[in-house]
Regions:
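Short, conserved sequence motifs enriched in acidic/basic residues, glycine, and aromatics
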Residues: 30-31, 69
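A short, conserved structural fragment
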Residues: 80-96
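Short helix-coil junctions and helix-kink-helix linkers
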Residues: 59-73
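Short, amphipathic alpha-helical interaction segments positioned at domain boundaries
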Residues: 103-118
Length: 118
């Protein structure tokens, strides 16, 4: 089998980030569930100064809950699981950040990997 190449064009907003997380998920130390990828991808999709300062603020949590039809408890459970898996972490100042190894390039992301038998 030769090299497999596939380009994905037209992924917008959270779909871009969810697809990115789905592609890298098998390579993570602890895989994220589909819903965890959806929650994190939605948070990753927010833009602007406010999002850059506090992406997990009450305002953005409300947006995620509405977009994904989650209860307060449901979102809290997913955020706890993401913390436990190292995908997000709480900083000394109390803000929550996304692990840098999960962040894709903004407009397009390239992937390259190889599997070797034996």
């Amino acid at each position: 089998m030769g090299i497999i190449q596939k380009g994905l064009v037209g992924l917008i907003g959270k779909d871009y980030y969810i697809r990115h997380l789905s592609i890298i998920n098998p390579f993570l130390p602890v895989e994220l569930t589909p819903k965890e990828r959806e929650v994190l991808g939605t948070f990753m999709s927010f833009r602007g100064d406010v999002a850059d300062k506090d992406r997990f603020s009450t305002y953005f949590r409300k947006e995620v809950k509405e977009a994904l039809k989650l209860s307060d408890g449901g979102l809290s459970n997913h955020l706890k699981a993401l913390k436990d898996k190292g995908a997000i972490r709480e900083e000394l100042n109390g803000s929550i950040t996304i692990a840098s190894f999960l962040l894709p390039a903004e407009k397009q992301q390239f992937y390259q990997f190889k599997i070797v038998e034996g």
